[in-house]
Amino acid sequence: MISIDEYLKKVDEVIANGKYKDTWESLSQYRIPDWYKNNRFGLFVHWGCYSVPAVESEWFPRQMYQKDTKSWEWRIKNLGENGDYRQIVERFHPDKFNADEWADIFYKSGAKHIMPVSEHHDGIKMYKSELNRWNTVELTGHDYQKELHEAFDKKGLKFFCSSHRAEHLWFLNGAVENVPGSEAHGETYRDLYGPCMSFDYSKSRPGHEDGIEAPEYWLKDWLASSCEMVENNRPWGIYFDWWIYQSEFKPYIRKFLAYFYNRCDDWGYTPVVFYKNGCMMQGCAVFDVERGQINSIAKDVWQCDTAIAKNSWGYTENNEFKSPYACAVNLIDVVSKNGCFMLNVGPKADGTICDEEKNVLLKLGEWLNVNGEAIYSSEPFTVFGEGKKQQNKAFNDNLEYSDRDYRFTYKPETIYAFPMSVKERT
């Protein structure tokens, strides 16, 4: 293991010796690469220890400590009054996982880049780490990120990482607030449960968890963890969830971007970083809209991320799933507005992909085999489409299109028109 401060010395050295410094002025040299815009379609993968119960959502680790939830009830029934998340972590043994099988399915979907979650809010790293023992190499003997990276390379798919480390500061605080017998009260497993910091709920907007300020030690932890993720995985892209929009993260975000862009310069390629809620300067990274759309053509390429499942990003039993048609029209709408579409899959805890999601992926691939010319390497036309159905917000991606709704894309000498409502919706 290595200390946070020791690791951050390496980060400072890379920035000192690199092209990019940790200022917005220096980072504005960055340009979003054409390879990303031309890809237009990628996949997100939510899979980890939180997949084991298959209850509610990938937020099970938090919800299991929140009274009056299905996850709380499941915990009491299956783990006991003082049951803890460590018991779930120890049950994660995906004996049916096969990276090459995933890569084959993803390749057939027509996606060009794949982004497995590298660390979700639960704090479990899906790769080898020298900063925290709670990683899958220590837990299962597998570096799942490395295995997937190698499998994707064989298929010509670019490998991305997703980090949700920032939220671990408070994610499991219900263990301390609501379960007197939880081991989260002690220090033995502090590196698993995290700080469990509580909110001032009177200052927190619903769904934002912003009634709290991240302390310096956590900001350093986030930066070191993010840079280690880069170093150990060498991804082409990195996605951060929403909570880094807190103002105290700003200088650490700049350091991360400078580090990542400099390291990729060393490795010979230009990467992408995704952000939400205005936490990065426009042009220095790619703006992301979760489960939503915009209502105009964006000057800079942007990203929409959404899931095949309607109620969760991770696998849950009795979930409902979107149709291939619904996913295809979402892809079309995003691309017509100069966006790239990131569609999520939530494999089961055993490492298999459920039939419902596999069917959507393969059907999309069949559609793209016919229509991909109008998607890959396309540009927006002078207008994105016709009709009245449009949205300009997140968390609302279930539009019902009429036979008057069309979307357009463009290549030199060719305009592609997509009818957004069809009689056969498979």
Across the structure, where does each feature detected by a protein language model lie?
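Mature catalytic domains of secreted/periplasmic carbohydrate-active enzymes
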Residues: 1-426
